[in-house]
């Protein structure tokens, strides 16, 4: 009996194994398995049933079920499937074999058209054949709203397509709707920044884009946004388009004329930006022996007031403020204060109320203490001196009497020089502390003439926005060599430190090392700033003058060109502010690469708005590349073409 039972189990296992092998062989011969097992499956899934029916009116059911003729899947449902009106509670989207179900968790609104836009997310499970752009829709009222609004969202600063940002419509035309009410209708941008809002009712709307971090479909400070002051009025008209049917990847089979409804507007461009943080608070304070520094979270025109509680601040400090007063350094002009370990300060500055954003004056008491006390700094200095003296004794034993005085810490100067400069550049000098005195008679600039150096004129000026930076202006001659000599003690710092003797030789590149680019900017005035780009880096920047942007002494290489409208004249691009209704400054790209050659002059005309913004940025500069769309692939025709070619 045990032997019979063993053989029965053995035969049963063998039969199961053979059945599995047979199934595998059959599957290999099944359509969709590849070139060795018959033709590819190129048929997209077909909808066989929708419950409730597509386009139902007066609908009350919150669950939608769609049945197909084959197993299907949804690609990236969280990004591609969009329900409108927006749902506060996330819809539940499920796939099970040949069925897809979507259950809305929010209560249905009366008299409203609902759309579930699947985009190209639905494919079959064998060859990923896409159903195509599919939108399910129904209405809780007596009619369906079918209008559409489409366009692109671009980053305002660099015209990059913004992927995955929400775009919404408000029928409430008040500016406050964006911050207090969820959108009426929504869509989401694809990788090209394109959006299409469906199921829109006739009427007037304001349109917005929103990177909705907190998921409430309303703008919250700090989120990326875009807005338009224009009123959006959806409309439509009958139109004709020509669809191309391909025999394979290179041959056209048929060009088909298709009548369709053309919805407008379909070319909106929203420029997305993040507002500057205008909430001003004191971020931190820092004390070094020779100075103390304060950092703020935002700029302000107000200059903080320092009142010394244990020292005389009126005569003991020198202020070095950044352009927006967001970083301020207070240099200690009195050496007694440098030695004082603790400085107590009543510090009055402009802060911002977090809720109302209104400025007010805040006074804090700051206790400013350096990392190392004066006593410890003196002890470390004494240790360094002892080491030097030991070294001195060793040098004396070797008969070396060249360094008889202890080293004194000099005033440091940094010169931004690469060995050569452009004829249109100047030399920049940076100090490590403010200068108490500069003797320009101890600065010497020489031009090399044959084998000797001849003194030439120059000007030395302190930069407007810092006490530490200076620019030396010279009348540079292309192709010539120069020598800059700065005598010791030419510059004396606030601490009494003096600079060392300084010599540097440099050359000015010749005219034949450069090219020139002259751009005529149609319709542009002096608010337009034009930039030469190497990738993302700005190589040169000029302001338009008399309708032209002229780039002299330009190094030979490939460039791209960007322009922005500098509305406030600060020479840099500025973001927008929704509360003030201020758009970010306009940005444009010249759509082609420009190659500058040595000893060549290039003339180029550019009309800033010749192309829509979404088509301006050269493809080589676009970082946000488009997704690979789920499109029919015609694999069988392609395989036959390869066979014929082989």
Go through each PLM region and give its residues:
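N-terminal targeting or signal-anchor segments and their processing/structural boundaries
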Residues: 2-646
């Amino acid at each position: 009996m045990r032997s019979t039972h063993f053989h029965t189990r053995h035969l049963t296992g063998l039969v199961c194994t053979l059945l599995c092998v047979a199934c595998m062989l059959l599957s290999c011969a099944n359509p969709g398995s590849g070139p060795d097992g018959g033709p590819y499956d190129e048929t997209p899934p077909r909808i066989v049933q929708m419950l409730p029916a597509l386009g139902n009116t007066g609908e009350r059911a919150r669950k939608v079920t769609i049945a197909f003729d084959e197993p299907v899947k949804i690609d990236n449902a969280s990004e591609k499937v969009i329900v409108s009106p927006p749902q506060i509670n996330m819809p539940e989207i499920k796939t099970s074999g040949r069925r897809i179900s979507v259950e809305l968790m929010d209560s249905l609104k009366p008299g409203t058209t609902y759309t579930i836009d699947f985009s190209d997310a639905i494919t079959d499970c064998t060859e990923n054949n896409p159903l195509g752009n599919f939108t399910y829709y129904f209405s809780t009222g007596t009619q369906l709203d079918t209008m559409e609004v489409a366009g692109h969202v671009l980053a305002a600063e660099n015209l990059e397509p913004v992927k995955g940002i929400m775009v919404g419509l408000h029928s409430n035309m008040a500016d406050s709707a964006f911050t207090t009410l969820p959108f009426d209708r929504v869509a989401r941008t694809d990788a090209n920044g394109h959006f299409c809002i469906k199921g829109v009712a006739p009427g007037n709307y304001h349109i917005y884009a929103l990177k909705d971090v907190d998921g409430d479909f309303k703008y919250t400070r700090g989120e990326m946004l875009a807005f338009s002051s224009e009123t959006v009025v959806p409309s439509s008209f009958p139109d004709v388009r020509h669809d191309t049917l391909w025999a394979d990847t290179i041959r056209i089979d048929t060009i088909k004329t298709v009548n369709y409804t053309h919805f407008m507007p379909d070319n909106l461009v929203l420029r997305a930006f993040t507002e500057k943080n205008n909430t001003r608070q004191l971020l931190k304070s820092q004390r070094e022996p020779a100075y103390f520094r304060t950092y703020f979270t935002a700029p302000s025109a107000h200059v903080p007031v320092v009142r010394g509680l244990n020292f005389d601040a009126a005569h003991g400090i020198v202020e070095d403020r950044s352009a927006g007063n967001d970083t301020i350094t207070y240099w200690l002009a009195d050496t007694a204060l440098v030695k004082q370990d603790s400085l107590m300060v009543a510090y009055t500055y402009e802060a911002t109320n977090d809720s109302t954003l209104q400025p007010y004056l805040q006074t804090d008491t700051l206790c400013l203490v350096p990392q190392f006390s004066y006593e410890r700094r003196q002890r470390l200095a004494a240790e360094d001196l002892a080491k030097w003296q030991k070294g001195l004794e060793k040098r004396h034993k070797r008969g070396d009497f060249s360094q008889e005085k202890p080293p004194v810490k000099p005033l440091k100067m940094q010169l931004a020089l690469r060995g050569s400069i452009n004829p249109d550049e100047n030399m920049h000098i940076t100090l490590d502390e403010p200068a108490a005195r500069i003797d320009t008679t101890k600065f010497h600039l020489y031009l090399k003439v044959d084998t000797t150096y001849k003194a030439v004129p120059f000007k030395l000026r302190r930069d407007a926005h810092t006490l530490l930076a200076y620019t030396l202006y010279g009348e540079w001659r292309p192709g010539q060599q120069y020598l800059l000599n700065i005598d010791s003690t030419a510059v004396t710092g606030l601490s009494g430190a003096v600079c060392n003797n300084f010599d540097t030789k440099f050359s000015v590149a010749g005219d034949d090392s450069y090219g020139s680019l002259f751009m005529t900017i149609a319709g542009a005035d002096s608010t337009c700033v034009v930039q030469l780009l190497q990738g993302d880096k700005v190589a040169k920047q000029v302001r338009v003058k008399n309708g032209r942007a002229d780039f002299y002494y330009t190094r030979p290489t490939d460039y791209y060109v960007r322009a922005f409208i500098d509305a406030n004249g600060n020479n840099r691009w500025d973001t927008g502010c929704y509360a003030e209704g201020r758009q970010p400054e306009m940005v444009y790209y010249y759509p082609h690469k420009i190659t500058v050659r040595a000893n060549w002059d290039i003339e180029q005309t550019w009309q800033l708005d010749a192309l829509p913004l979404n088509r301006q940025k050269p493809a080589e500069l676009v970082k946000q590349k488009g997704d690979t769309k789920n499109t029919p692939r015609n694999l069988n025709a392609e395989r036959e073409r390869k066979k014929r070619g082989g």
